[in-house]
UniProtKB/Swiss-Prot annotation:
One of its GO terms (molecular function) is structural constituent of ribosome. It is found in: Mitochondrion. It comes from Bos taurus (Bovine). Component of the mitochondrial ribosome small subunit (28S) which comprises a 12S rRNA and about 30 distinct proteins. InterPro entries: Ribosomal_mS26 (IPR026140). It comes from the Eukaryota. Transmembrane segments: none annotated. The gene is MRPS26. It holds the Pfam family MRP-S26. One of its GO terms (cellular component) is mitochondrial inner membrane. GO terms for biological process: mitochondrial translation. Keywords: Mitochondrion, Ribonucleoprotein, Ribosomal protein, Transit peptide. This is Small ribosomal subunit protein mS26. Residues 1-26 form a transit peptide. The keyword Transcription does not apply.
Amino acid sequence: MLRALSTLGARPLGRPPAQFLLLARGRKTRHDPPAKSKIGRVATPPAVDPAEFFVLTERYRQYRQTVRALRQEFVTEVRRKVHEARAGVLAERKALQDAAEHRELMAWNQAENQRLHELRMARLRQEAREQEQWQAEEAAREAREAEAWARLKEQEVLQLQEDAKNFITRENLEARVEEALDSPKSYNWAVTREGQVVTPQHKGS
C-alpha cells in the first residue's frame, strides 16, 4: 500500500495518472460459488440467553441515551460559546455605534441650541427696539396731545376774555338797557317743530 502510494506521489508533472489495481478483500457476491469446504454447511446462529439479551439491550439503550445527552450538552455548550462570542462582538459594535450616534446627537443638539439662542437674542433685541420706538411714539403723542390741550385751553381763555367784554355788569347795566331799547332788532319770533323761524306779520306790511 505504501509502495503504491509512493509511486503515486512520484508521478512526474504534466502526465495523466495511470490506472493501478489494488488488492482488496471483501464479501462474495450472491453470484459467486461457495467454497468447497462450505458446501452443505448450514449456518446456525449462536444461542442467545433471553436474560442476557435483555440486559445487553437495556445497557445499549442506556448507553445511547447517555451518549445522546452528552452530545446534546456539548452541542449546546459550543453553540452558547459561539453565541456569547458573537453577541459580545455585536454588543461591542453596537456600543461603539451607540457612542458615535450619541456624539453626533450631542453635537447636533449643541448646534441647534446655539442657533435657537441666536434667534432668541435677535428676537429680544428686535422687541427691545420696537418697545423703545413705541415708547418714543407714545411720548411724542402724549406731548402733542398736551400741547393741543394747552392751546385749546388758551383759546378758551382768550374767548372767555373776549366774551367777558360784553358781559352786563352793574356799572354798564343802564347803558345796556338803553342800547337794547334803542336797537331796532326784534326778538319777537318763534321756531316751529321743523326748525323754521316764524316772525309776526304786521297789518300794514
